[in-house]
Amino acid sequence: MTSIGIDLGTTYSCVGVWLNDRVEIIANDQGNRTTPSYVAFNDTERLIGDAAKNQVAMNPINTVFDAKRLIGRKFSDSVVQSDMKHWPFKVITNKNDDKPLIQVDFKGETKTFSPEEISSMVLSKMKETAESYLGKPVNNAVITVPAYFNDGQRQATKDAGTISKLNVQRIINEPSAAAIAYGLDKKGSKSGEIKVLIFDLGGGTFDVSLLSIDDGVFEVLATAGDTHLGGEDFDNRLVNHFVDEFKRKHKKDIMGNQRALRRLRTACERAKRTLSSSSQASVEIDSLYDGIDFYTSITRARFEELCSDLFNNCIEPVEKVLKDCKLDKKSIDEIVLVGGSTRIPKVQQLIQNLFNGKELNKSINPDEAVAYGAAVQAAILSGDKSSRISELIFIDVAPLSLGIETVGGVMTNIVPRNTIIPCKKTQTFSTHTDNQSGVLIQVYEGERTMTKDNNLLGKFELTGIPPAPRGTPQIEVSFDVDSNGILNVTAEDKTTKKVEKITITNDKGRLSLKDITKMVEDAEKFKEQDQQQKERIESKNNLENYIFSVKNSINDQKIISKLSKSDKNIIESETESTLKWLESNQSAEKDEFNQKISDLESIVNPILSKFYQGNNNPKPTTTTFNQDLD
């Protein structure tokens, strides 16, 4: 039973598989080992990955990215509202449950998709990439999420996997996966326990995890982070800087022009990467807006100044995990960098300064480490007996405190943050007033004292409590956190033995089973449409290839001398006629293209066969150029 590991990233995704006693990171159909987390819609087809990102400047409002910044969040969330200012695509609210929906034009119709559906399309692409490489279907996967993802975001990611027809064996934390990659790489090189800090700064999220690694046992001691900090935020600072510069130089504001903004953002992303290895980067965009060319440059020092507060925000979570573990900086044996944004020199400098100049560990590929670790975990969960991984033990923690609201709106923690998971914790509560017949259990996650400042996960009632003075009934509340970090809560009246429970996936914004079932059906329908479109284009290309193959044949000197003028005229007339039809009917159906090939072959083949029967030359065929098909 093959299982794959998928790093579902904000900007790029990556897939790996355990094969022949090692992890293989699988290249996509473009030969790239990471795939843009982009989905595009147009009048004829849906594009995913490189194909979607490559056309974004031409079709910005129907090209969706950053689904990870929407998944599991409410439309009214201030983070979502802020992000919407930077996105060219339209995000609307589902009025019933404050859930964000992405609106696009697809095949002439207005369609809406949930963030889970967009993420499922990216997951499907990664699944297909693995299946193409392995040559067999893949149904099982381990998917990674930021360590600081809350319960709703984890469940929504699991739902995305379900929509893409994957059995999600486990949701694991990204820095934990990276630690597996590091630990496996170093297995046997160091004896005894080592303390490793994983610093994971990606395209959209930031995590820090502190682990103890000892002879194949990986124990997460503490984790912290920011689910909304990464390379995209640095890009935003550059975009705003150059928008202001363009306005200052040319007295024109490009903020309202999505195509110009997208071209500028692509140039900013390129400049940011250049600044990791050079002290200055050029930005050159022809005819950016109103026919005006925009040629400018930026220094690394200016970039660092623009992003200084964001870079400094990376340090606080590091200090937090050290404090949570009651460890000083000298106790850390290795600082491992993960995520593309850790290539930024200023980020490396700040970490190094914090640890008094300690050398940073750059031994693992920052773009692939998370998928690598996920692939190892997938192999373990699938029962792989390889001696390299069979004895690995992984112990993770709950990233946020979990508790209930008690009198006065106070947060009473039942599972403190950094508790080892899976776990079950129980506390006993009682009634607040005499003869109280029911209690409302409101479940929250977060670190603030008052529940109003934390995140409500769900609520339920336990009723039928027998009349008794306040403080008499014994109500036992149990929190059960599974290996995915997803929570189940049970409340039991010890007198009546009455039990009520809630799986904290019934959160208001979460997809219902009915929603998921429909989305699975839609995904299958889109997959069929994608296949039909692929076959249609192949038939169109086959027809075009055949026409030019025939034209080349009748211009071959060996053939011209053997063909009568009338035969040559017939072939020329038919090929020209078919070519004109093709140019005017680019959107024709597969069967129409195939029929045109048959019609042309029925005229051309009898004529050319006279020549080919006596020669060894190959006849023109519809498959001459199939290797060039996309």
Curated annotation (Swiss-Prot):
Residues 611-630 are annotated as: Disordered. GO terms for biological process: chaperone cofactor-dependent protein refolding; protein refolding. One of its GO terms (molecular function) is heat shock protein binding. Signal peptide: none annotated. Keywords: ATP-binding, Chaperone, Nucleotide-binding. One of its GO terms (cellular component) is cytoplasm. Pfam families: HSP70. Residues 615-630 have a biased composition (Low complexity). InterPro entries: ATPase_NBD, Heat_shock_70_CS, HSP70_C_sf, HSP70_peptide-bd_sf, Hsp_70_fam. Belongs to the heat shock protein 70 family. May function in protein folding and assembly, and disassembly of protein complexes. This is Heat shock cognate 70 kDa protein 3.
